[in-house]
Amino acid sequence: MRLDKFIAENVGLTRSQATKAIRQSAVKINGEIVKSGSVQISQEDEIYFEDELLTWIEEGQYFMLNKPQGCVCSNDDGDYPTIYQFFDYPLAGKLHSAGRLDVDTTGLVLLTDDGQWSHRITSPKHHCEKTYLVTLADPVEENYSAACAEGILLRGEKEPTKPAKLEILDDYNVNLTISEGRYHQVKRMFAALGNKVVGLHRWKIGDVVLDESLEEGEYRPLTQSEIEKLVK
């Protein structure tokens, strides 16, 4: 691994900030000051930042987070805090989300440092299903289930959505399971049906269900069974 990448991930800096710190003699490898961020390092090396020994994070980290409203799933956003505020560095710098939720959508987000694993979840060819609890502004109509099962043509698109499963819970709440990830898909599906989504909560990805014991903003590691369920 490059030294500047390691420093950025472990200290919580951008790559350019890490490079600047290295040039300013803030980093030592095995007791020697190093001023080049391109130096390759390994876990056998002792890396110091401002005289503090940094620890290596093992590869293969998998978590579920109960995302609250008001934060985004990107690593950096000028308008909203990100979900990575809930994780301490150096861990936060190594994770990415396997799929995203809008700023006003709550619920299950999966995070990992394993790119191949997350690709299996997000790639359209794997058809990983996601289930949402949807709260609507107007009462549910009888034709919604059939319309979702047949596919709905969204505004501005040429192809209808893939068949989706809709379970009516009461007059204003439904569970919707989709296998795509189009832009604002759930909201646009109900807009096409003449309704409006006023609450959206993802509680299931594949066969993994959001842990009910997690408060908003809390996370826990996935079990080995959960990790394997998502790539079976």
Swiss-Prot record:
CDD domains referenced in this protein's UniProt entry, alphabetically: PseudoU_synth_RsuA, S4
GO MF, any single term: pseudouridine synthase activity
Reactions it catalyzes: uridine(516) in 16S rRNA = pseudouridine(516) in 16S rRNA
Protein role: Responsible for synthesis of pseudouridine from uracil-516 in 16S ribosomal RNA.
Pfam families with a match to the protein in the record: PseudoU_synth_2, S4
S4 RNA-binding domain ranges (all copies): 1-68
InterPro entries from the UniProt entry: PsdUridine_s_RsuA/RluB/E/F_cat, PsdUridine_synth_cat_dom_sf, PsdUridine_synth_RsuA/RluA, PsdUridine_synth_RsuA/RluB/E/F, PsdUridine_synth_RsuA/RluB_CS, RsuA_PseudoU_synthase, S4_RNA-bd, S4_RNA-bd_sf
Protein name: Ribosomal small subunit pseudouridine synthase A
The keyword Cell membrane is assigned to this record: no
Protein keywords: Isomerase, RNA-binding, rRNA processing
Broad class of enzyme this protein falls into: isomerase
Record-stated family: Belongs to the pseudouridine synthase RsuA family.
NCBIfam families per UniProt: PRK10839.1, pseudouridine synthase
Organism classification: Bacteria, Pseudomonadati, Pseudomonadota, Gammaproteobacteria, Pasteurellales
Enzyme Commission number(s) from the entry: 5.4.99.19
Organism: Haemophilus influenzae (strain ATCC 51907 / DSM 11121 / KW20 / Rd)
Record: active site: D102 (nucleophile)
One of the record's GO cellular component terms: cytosol
GO biological process per UniProt: enzyme-directed rRNA pseudouridine synthesis
